Curated annotation (Swiss-Prot):
It is found in: Cytoplasm. SMART domains: tRNA_SAD (SM00863). GO terms for cellular component: cytosol. One of its GO terms (molecular function) is ATP binding. This is Threonine--tRNA ligase. Keywords: Aminoacyl-tRNA synthetase, ATP-binding, Cytoplasm, Ligase, Metal-binding, Nucleotide-binding, Protein biosynthesis, RNA-binding, tRNA-binding, Zinc. Zn(2+) binds at C337, H388, H513. It holds the Pfam family tRNA-synt_2b. Its EC number is 6.1.1.3. Binds 1 zinc ion per subunit. Belongs to the class-II aminoacyl-tRNA synthetase family. It catalyses: tRNA(Thr) + L-threonine + ATP = L-threonyl-tRNA(Thr) + AMP + diphosphate + H(+).
Length: 638
């Protein structure tokens, strides 16, 4: 008799004389593992716990406390929600897709005669609880493609039919729980009773298959956790995130707006927001000049032929906007790199000229689908702090280290911790093995030399080169992709960039794309939520407000305001005939760092009484001393 040999992650081997399942193997190892098991990976393929194992291979039990396990748990919760919605709304609703996503899951529904709202959530959650209590077995079924089409057509699930018709496979997998059936690859939990804690959180619109040409669906977002304590912790964090929502704070502080008249995803900056953005951009310019970058500028539109040369036309044109000028096609730039290539090519370069570091705060436009637009965090028009570093191969290691040090210093200024990932060569790529080895080695060496911890994403680099991604962590422990360092073998080749080496021969330079903050709009959105609108003094659009106690001090308050403004302080003067407490509270709501109260005593002494927005009072001081105080506080960022 041939034994089935199963190799476990620790290298141990278990033998079985007959067919077994991952669930049985987990139970044989220990009851604790069996309770935590949600799925398995057998020979690098994700499977259910009840999947029969009939051959030898490698097995890993996937538990609930792993990212993959939580994804399986939430994917099953998505099916549970769809089941509940179908039970409650019947044939009025068609189900479409429902994946697990970061921090939860969603399911998209088509329903002509009912608009889902938070008012429906309690009813849906109640039905979900009933299905959990019923502990329905969740069973996988392999059927022919034609049988699946016939089944879902009979059920009136036309979106499922469309999905299956687009598949080439002769068979598809279905998952059943009670009278609910869904098209799915799996894996899933063994039964509905394994789901312990969930909450529906919001509803939004989403186009079928992400195309505005298709029907508008209703997307219900939700989350699920292994226990109620974890769920409560997450919901508390979610509530705090709502309070910090940059769209709400941006409106309350009069920073920016969006208008359907202008177009979706296009930011309109109000005076305070434009000033905040200007302060941030000025900071970037100073830092780049200090670190040896040259500031450059490129046009907003470039000829279509140039986008064909770069490869963007073939690979990115669906995300671009095009126009015609005097019969000549032009593309509105979605990226800043092409003008930088032309600047380099404007004259012959020598090895003595390198490295060249071109920096541009360049505004770009990308045709993002309307369903993914989200305040400042996802827009169609935005400005990137793009730089392209063109250097010799021998200079690559040092240039990468310089960029990483730049990122480290900037993140410290804003108070962000961050995580680093390096992505290596994918299966489909361009460039020689030597190019990839040199570039990947340079990225790795820089991280090692600077003692920066990092994760490696094998095979996740771009086709044109390896990269480092830096994700900052905000006050709510959320991750945001901002800085990127990307090696590029494509553009130097496509634009025939060369330099004359010490040997008098022409050589191909190495190029790095890099951003530090990324999109300025997105970074400001992250800053607003990180600080909850309480910007540090150097970034605050209004640094202080002068508040008079009575009309007697109005002239003095105005003179103080004028003097501070002349000294470079961004100041307002509140002379309204309102009570002092009211004006102080309003300044706190506006998140102005300092309130300078002036009454008869201050007027007589020629001073102001500073009060921080937290309520802490400073000793009275002269307007000149306060201006110096602000100057010293902000000098480190100038």
């Amino acid at each position: 008799m041939v034994m089935i040999q199963i190799e476990l992650p620790d290298g141990s081997i278990k033998e079985f004389s007959e067919t077994t399942t991952p669930g049985d193997i987990a139970a044989g190892i220990g009851s604790g593992l069996a309770r935590q098991a949600v799925a398995a990976r057998f020979n690098d393929r994700m499977v259910d716990l009840c999947t029969p194992i009939t051959e030898s291979g490698r097995l890993e039990i996937i538990t609930l406390n792993s990212p993959q396990g939580l994804e399986v748990y939430r994917h099953t919760a998505a099916h549970l929600m769809a089941h509940a919605v179908k039970d409650l709304y019947g044939d009025r609703v068609q189900v479409t897709i429902g994946p697990a996503v970061e921090n939860g899951f969603y399911y998209d529904f088509y329903c002509e005669d009912h608009a889902f709202s938070p008012d429906d959530f309690e009813k849906i959650e109640k039905r979900m609880q009933e299905l959990v209590k019923a502990n329905l077995p969740i069973e996988r079924e392999e059927v022919s493609r034609d049988s699946a089409i016939a089944l879902f057509r009979e059920l009136g699930e036309h979106y499922k039919v469309e999905l299956i018709e687009d598949l080439d496979a002769p068979t598809v997998s279905l998952y059943r729980q009670g009278d609910f059936v869904d098209l799915c690859r799996g894996p899933h939990l063994p039964s509905t009773g394994r789901i312990k804690a969930f909450k529906l959180t919001s509803v939004a619109g989403a186009y079928w298959r992400g195309s505005e040409k298709n029907a508008m669906l209703q997307r219900i977002y939700a989350t699920a956790f292994p226990d109620k304590k974890e769920l409560r912790t997450y919901l508390n964090k979610l509530e705090e995130a709502r309070k910090r929502d940059h769209r709400r704070i941006g409106r309350e502080l009069d920073l920016f707006s969006f208008s359907e008249e202008a177009g979706a995803g296009l930011v309109i900056w109000h005076p305070k927001g434009a000033l905040l953005r200007t302060l941030l951009e000025d900071f970037e310019r100073r830092e780049h000049l200090r670190r040896g970058y040259d500031i450059v500028m490129g046009p907003q539109i470039l000829r279509t032929d140039l986008w064909k040369t770069s490869g963007h036309f073939d690979n990115y044109r669906e995300n671009m906007y095009f126009t015609d000028v005097d019969g000549q096609g032009y593309g509105i730039k979605p990226m800043n790199c092409l003008a930088h290539m032309l600047i380099y090519k404007a004259r012959q370069r020598s090895y003595r000229d390198l490295p060249l570091r071109y920096f541009e705060l360049g505004t770009v436009h990308r045709h993002e689908k309307s369903g993914v637009l989200h305040g400042l965090l996802r827009v169609r028009g935005f400005t990137q702090d793009d730089a392209h570093i063109i250097c010799t191969p021998d200079q690559l290691d040092e240039e990468i280290k310089r960029v990483l040090e730049f990122v480290r210093d900037v993140m410290a200024i804003f108070g962000f911790e961050y995580e680093i990932e390096i992505s290596t060569r994918p299966e489909k790529s361009i460039g020689s093995d030597a190019d990839w080895e040199r570039a990947t080695g340079a990225l790795m060496n820089a991280l090692k030399d600077l003692e920066l911890p990092h994760d490696v994403n094998e095979g996740d680099g771009a086709f044109y080169g390896p990269k480092i991604d830096i994700k900052l962590k905000d006050a709510l422990d959320r991750r945001w992709q901002c800085a990127t360092i990307q090696c590029d073998f494509t553009l130097p080749e496509r634009f025939d960039l060369t330099y004359v080496g010490k040997d008098g021969e022409k050589h191909r330079p190495v190029m790095l794309h890099r951003v530090i903050l990324g999109a300025i709009e997105r970074f400001i959105g992250v800053l607003i939520e990180h600080y909850a609108g309480n910007f540090p003094l150097w970034l605050a659009p209004v640094q202080a407000v002068v508040i008079n106690v009575t009309d007697n001090q109005a002239d003095y308050a105005k003179s103080v305001s004028d003097a501070l403004r002349a000294a470079g302080v961004r100041v307002q003067c509140d002379l309204r005939n309102e009570k002092l407490g009211f004006k102080i509270r309003e300044a706190q709501v506006d998140k102005i760092p300092y309130m300078l109260v002036v009454g008869d005593t201050e007027m007589s002494d020629g001073t102001v009484a500073p009060r921080f927005r937290s309520g802490k009072n400073l000793e009275p001081m002269s307007p000149e001393d306060f201006a110096r105080f602000v100057q010293e506080e902000c000098d480190q960022y100038r």
